């Protein structure tokens, strides 16, 4: 029987329970994934502590992960058992050995990318894609300012913006973070 982290009440890390859970079969449009890695994000803490309310209790935390497809539901044609996938922006359930997720939330993992990297990139990467392409399409010659340039989203955003040809100004809270930001795409860093 697979295991999962379950939360029955809001609180600190002590409210998380590691439990046996039934192996769920994927429904229409869903896939089941044998987890290789998960991303741990502040949003998981917000839900666990009750800062954001879960739509149901108990629940399994987690919004992104990566692994191998073990089963596909009706109508799923883009994946088959054995495919390596990463996924993000699911309602919850990633802190599990074999979660069932919407196939539409998954993407194939390219050769040369390991599951740990893929799992850690999904929510942060989707956030950056949204900001640098949909909110404002960054183009060569633009100058952008990125707050918290050495944070998880900031490190991806600064590299991506630099790749797009922008001049990147980042902010950081320490000399060490400023150096990290410079190593990851910032042309200039403001210490605060």
What does each of the following model-derived ranges do?
Residues 5, 31-32, 145:
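Conserved beta-strand elements of the Class I
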Residues 22-39, 51-93:
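Glycine-rich beta-strand-centered segment in the early N-terminal region that forms part
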Residues 162-192:
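Adenosine-nucleotide cofactor-binding segment
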Residues 43-49:
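Cytochrome P450 core scaffold surrounding the K-helix E-X-X-R motif
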Residues 84, 157-158, 178:
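Generic hydrophobic/aromatic pocket-lining and core-packing "Φ" positions
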Residues 78, 87-148, 160:
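NAD(P)H dinucleotide-binding glycine-rich loop of Rossmann-like/cofactor-binding domains
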Residues 152-153:
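Hydrophobic/small residue at the entry helix of a nucleotide-binding pocket
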């Amino acid at each position: 029987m697979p295991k999962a982290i379950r939360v029955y009440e809001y609180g600190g890390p002590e409210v998380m329970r590691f439990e046996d859970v039934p192996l769920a079969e994927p429904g229409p449009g869903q896939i089941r994934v044998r987890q290789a890695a998960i991303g741990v994000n502040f949003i998981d803490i917000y839900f666990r502590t009750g800062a954001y309310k879960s739509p149901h209790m108990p629940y399994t935390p987690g919004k992104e992960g990566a692994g191998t497809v073990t089963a596909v539901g009706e109508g799923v044609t883009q994946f088959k058992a054995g495919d390596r996938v990463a996924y993000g922006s699911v309602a919850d359930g990633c802190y599990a050995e074999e979660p069932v997720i919407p196939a539409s939330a998954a993407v194939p993992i390219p050769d040369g990318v390991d599951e740990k990297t893929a799992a850690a990139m999904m929510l942060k990467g989707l956030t950056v894609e949204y900001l640098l392409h949909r909110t404002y399409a960054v183009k060569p010659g633009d100058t952008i300012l990125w707050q918290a340039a050495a944070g998880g989203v900031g490190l991806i955003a600064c590299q991506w913006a630099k790749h797009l040809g922008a001049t990147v100004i980042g902010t950081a809270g320490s000399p060490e973070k400023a150096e990290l930001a410079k190593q990851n795409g910032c042309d200039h860093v403001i210490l605060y």
